[in-house]
């Protein structure tokens, strides 16, 4: 065949494209299990951080040792399923994104032996997705710790939602509101309540508001579950308290 002909060029190009595509497809298939394992470990690391559980040398072992239950609930607060703890089954960001529009929803709740309950959130930031995990105290209303992440927020500004320890620390002790706005991240002058929000990051107003909107939306998803289980928790606590004998002998 004439190597200078158009036919040769076309055939050569087609063969080259097919070979490269096959190599890339094989590489993607070969690397997929490793990539999925890394995503799972990263997700669990963030969940553990929100639960204030120090990850050991093996993140998966730490999770299995410290988790008490991993369940799925709907927006009515009813349990609709369980996640496999032995397999370290968790919802990654793709599944969290799907749950935003899913009907009915199956929302993950991670309950740890130290009394912390962790719920996730996922939404849109300024330049890409943002997500996070919120750990609640036993009253299921007071925040113990948070862990946030992002993909593409501006370094030194919006990226501080994940990189700035003081921002995450500001959430400790805050509570979820009871009105239309459950939580907000705005400038101090614009905040409606002191307890149900934190200050926006200076220079990153849009990212801060986006995270506030994301938290507000997901707290809304979990509102019924949190309120129902607060009542259960209170009843259990009351049952454990022995009545005081006020009659003098």
Where are the model-predicted features located?
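Flexible, solvent-exposed loop/hinge segments and secondary-structure transition points
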Residues: 2-249
